[in-house]
Amino acid sequence: MKLLLDSHAFLWWLAEDPRLSAGARQAVADPAATVFVSAATIWELSIKAALGRLDLGGADLVEEIAGNDFVELPVKARHSLAAAYLPRHHGDPFDRMLIAQAQIEGLTLVSRDAALRAYEIQILPA
């Protein structure tokens, strides 16, 4: 299975937070799974940390990706174009990027955001 972690799913995984569903935890831990973290997610979390809205506890998110055997997913031009032309069911630009990436790359998005269900993507509840 190829998974793309939404920002909250990524943070919950790192913190071993019980809010991450058992199904999501099992899927991410599966050695056969390839787990992606978007560069857009790192950008989003870094912005929130810089604004004082998120405490990363000194975590180096890039090191956390590698340390958990996740794969960094770059934002490509085709992702950007697809995100721009998605239906306006969801207004958050970071979530729209993840939707576009999931569609183009054939990934299952791990998220608890109910608004994402309006799009034609596979979702694993976080």
Predicted regions and their residues:
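Residue-level signal for well-ordered alpha-helical positions
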Residues: 16-17, 48, 86, 122
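Short glycine/serine/threonine-enriched helix-capping/active-site loop
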Residues: 37-38, 75
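Phosphate/NTP-binding elements of NTP-utilizing enzymes
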Residues: 45
